From Swiss-Prot:
Annotated gene: MT-CYB
Role according to the record: Component of the ubiquinol-cytochrome c reductase complex (complex III or cytochrome b-c1 complex) that is part of the mitochondrial respiratory chain. The b-c1 complex mediates electron transfer from ubiquinol to cytochrome c. Contributes to the generation of a proton gradient across the mitochondrial membrane that is then used for ATP synthesis.
GO biological process: mitochondrial electron transport, ubiquinol to cytochrome c
Residues engaged in binding heme b b566: 102, 203
Protein name per the record: Cytochrome b
Residues holding a ubiquinone: 208
Membrane topology according to the record: Multi-pass membrane protein
Biological source species: Zea mays (Maize)
C-alpha cells in the first residue's frame, strides 16, 4: 500500500484507529475463560436497554392520569409494543444478572488488586448507577407496586438527620408521590443510561491501560493474542446462549419476575399487603431490615458499596487467583451463598425467624470484606505477582 493510500485508509483515521486499537487488535491473555465474556455482554445489554427505551418513550405519556393507560396502549395497540416492553423490562434484569456475574468473577479472581484499582472502583460506581436507574425505571408504569415502591424507597431519605424531610420533599416535588415525581423520575431515567454509557467507556479505557486479568492471576506481556477474531468467536458461544435464554424468558415467561399488583393502576388509598422490591434490591433490602432502627438500617446501605470500593486498597496479596488460595475460595463460596440467602430473606415478611436469619447473614456479608486481606497473605510458597 502506498503512502498516499495509507493516508486515506479508514483504519488510519483517528477514530477508527482508536476503535481498532481497543476492539480488534487489543492484546488479550490467551487463557481467558468464558467468564471473561460478561463484560462485553453487559455492554450489549446496555445498548438494548437504550434502544428499546427510546422507542418506548415515543408512545409513553409521563402523567399520573395517562401513564398506566399509555403502557397498556403500548402493549395492545402499538405494533411490536409488547415485545419492546418485555425486552426493556426483562432486559433490565438480564443486564443486572450479567453484571452480578461479572462482579463475582472479579471477586473470585481478585481483579480489583493492583494495578487495576481504578477499573474496579469505576465498576462499583457503574453498579450503583445501574441500581438507581433500575429503581427510577420501575416508577413510570405507574402501577400499585410502582407507586408504593417509590413512596417507600424515597421515604428512606427522611432518616438523614436535619435535612432528611427536605430531601424527601425535593425528591417528590411536593408532599407526596405525584405527577411531579413521575415527571422527574422519567426525565432522570432518560439521562442516567447515557451517563452509564459514558462511565462504561471510561471503565473500558481504564481496563485497557494495564490489560485484562486472567484465571491464573499471572501478569505476562508475552502470552497474548489479538481480541479479533479469537475471542470474538469464543465469546460468540456465550452470546448465543444468552440470546436463547433471554428469548425463552421474554416469549414464555415475561412476567416471572414481575408483581401482579403492578397491573393495578396506582392508587394512594389502599396499601398493598406486602411491598416487595425487585429482585436486585432484595439483598440490600434484607440488610436494611436487619437493623430495627430506621436510621441505622439506612446507614447500613452505604457500607455495602464502601466495602466494594475499599477492596483494591487492602494490602497486596502474594497470589491473586482464588484457584491457588483455598481459604479465600471457600470464603468466596460462602459469600455467594450468603448473598442468595439475603435475597430470599429480602422478600419474606418482617417476622421471626426471618429477621434473625437476616441479621446473621448481614453480619457475615460485612465480615467477608473485613477478613479478605487475611487469606490473601497466606501462601508465601507460591510466587508473588509482579507488575513489571
Amino acid at each position: 500500500m502506498t503512502i498516499r493510500n495509507q493516508r486515506f485508509s479508514l483504519l488510519k483515521q483517528p477514530i477508527y484507529s482508536t476503535l481498532n486499537q481497543h476492539l480488534i487488535d487489543y492484546p488479550t491473555p490467551s487463557n481467558l475463560s468464558y467468564w471473561w465474556g460478561f463484560g462485553c455482554l453487559a455492554g450489549i445489554c446496555l445498548v438494548i436497554q437504550i434502544v428499546t427505551g427510546v422507542f418506548l418513550a415515543m408512545h409513553y405519556t409521563p402523567h399520573v392520569d395517562l401513564a398506566f393507560n399509555s403502557v397498556e396502549h403500548i402493549m395492545r395497540d402499538v405494533e411490536g409494543g409488547w415485545l419492546l416492553r418485555y425486552m426493556h423490562a426483562n432486559g433490565a434484569s438480564m443486564f443486572l444478572i450479567v453484571v452480578h456475574l461479572h462482579i463475582f468473577r472479579g471477586l473470585y479472581h481478585a481483579s480489583y488488586s493492583s494495578p487495576r484499582e481504578f477499573v474496579w472502583c469505576l465498576g462499583v460506581v457503574i453498579f450503583l448507577l445501574m441500581i438507581v436507574t433500575a429503581f427510577i425505571g420501575y416508577v413510570p408504569p405507574w402501577g400499585q407496586m410502582s407507586f408504593w415502591g417509590a413512596t417507600v424507597i424515597t421515604s428512606l431519605a427522611s432518616a438523614i438527620p436535619v435535612v432528611g424531610d427536605t430531601i424527601v420533599t425535593w425528591l417528590w416535588g411536593g408532599f407526596s408521590v405525584d405527577n411531579a415525581t413521575l415527571n422527574r423520575f422519567f426525565s432522570l431515567h432518560h439521562l442516567l443510561p447515557l451517563i452509564l454509557a459514558g462511565a462504561s467507556l471510561l471503565h473500558l479505557a481504564a481496563l485497557h491501560q494495564y490489560g485484562s486479568n486472567n484465571p491464573l492471576g499471572v501478569h505476562s506481556e508475552m502470552d497474548k493474542i489479538a481480541s479479533y477474531p479469537y475471542f470474538y468467536v469464543k465469546d460468540l458461544v456465550g452470546r448465543v446462549a444468552s440470546a436463547i435464554f433471554f428469548s425463552i424468558w421474554i416469549f414464555f415467561a415475561p412476567n416471572v419476575l414481575g408483581h401482579p399488583d403492578n397491573y393495578i393502576p396506582a392508587n394512594p388509598m389502599p396499601t398493598p399487603p406486602h411491598i416487595v422490591p425487585e429482585w436486585y434490591f432484595l439483598p440490600i433490602h434484607a440488610i436494611l431490615r436487619s437493623i430495627p432502627d430506621k436510621a441505622g438500617g439506612v446507614a447500613a446501605i452505604a457500607p455495602v458499596f464502601i466495602s466494594l470500593l475499599a477492596l483494591p486498597f487492602f494490602k497486596e496479596m502474594y497470589v491473586r487467583s482464588s484457584s491457588f488460595r483455598p481459604i479465600h475460595q471457600g470464603i468466596f463460596w460462602l459469600l455467594l451463598a450468603d448473598c442468595l440467602l439475603l435475597g430470599w430473606i429480602g422478600c419474606q415478611p418482617v417476622e421471626a425467624p426471618f429477621v434473625t436469619i437476616g441479621q446473621i447473614s448481614s453480619f457475615f456479608f460485612f465480615l467477608f470484606f473485613a477478613i479478605t486481606p487475611i487469606p490473601g497473605r497466606v501462601g508465601r510458597g507460591i510466587p508473588k505477582y509482579y507488575t513489571e
